[in-house]
Amino acid sequence: PPPQQYIALYEYDAMQPDELTFKENDVINLIKKVDADWWQGELVRTKQIGMLPSNYVQQI
């Protein structure tokens, strides 16, 4: 199945090496919901994979 895609509602600057930095309106493919607050995703624009705060994105 195609990946679930999310759009970034806000800009986020990574605070840890395993986190994604992204801009508002970036598209992110969901890889895994690690827990309620942190998900793993792939930033479509750069193909970078990392953790992101779930409250910064909304499903497309």
For each feature predicted by the language model, list its residue ranges.
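Src homology 3 (SH3)-mediated interaction modules
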Residues: 1-60
